[in-house]
Amino acid sequence: MTRLTRVSLWAAAAVMSVAVSASDASAQSLGVRAGASVDPDQFYFGGHYETAPLAEHVHFRPNLELGVGNDLTTVAVNLEVVYKAPLRRQPWTFYGGGGPAINFYDTDRGSDTEGGFNILGGLEHDKGLFFEVKFGLIDSPDLKFGIGYVFGK
């Protein structure tokens, strides 16, 4: 593991711990995620933390994703906010949102840190399963398709 990757993981852990301590423990949730990205073409996995509502239906949901493949390792720290819109008489909730990203890229030729922005949408089931699509702007991966699970639902 390179120095850049270690530093980025520590920075992400610090951001997540501040978010966790700032919210009511009973309304917090943790989740895991995995999927595939386009440009760079990678598989990724990671986790997220979701706060209690900041406003009605609005949650802060920072997440950390580690991507591998295409002779590249990516660590993405995504500081996203989502708006949740429950579907009537359904166990599913639509959500949309976005936020800034810090992307750490590591190859055999060196490493780089780039800023980006994500726009996302997804469906989350009352039992915790979710599906998500993320569009990356600036220097974030162009497109991500993910699936995940939120614990404690």
Where are these regions (language model features)?
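Outer-membrane beta-barrel "beta-signal"
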Residues: 81, 140-153
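Cleavable N-terminal export/targeting peptides
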Residues: 1-28
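Transmembrane beta-strands of outer-membrane beta-barrel proteins
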Residues: 28-32, 60-62, 77, 94-98, ...
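Surface-exposed, polar helix/loop patches in the mature regions of secreted/periplasmic/lumenal proteins
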Residues: 91-93, 97-135
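Residues that define the transmembrane beta-barrel architecture of outer-membrane proteins
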Residues: 28, 41-45, 71-77, 92-94, ...
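Strand-connecting loop/turn motifs
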Residues: 27-29, 53-57, 89-93, 126-128, ...
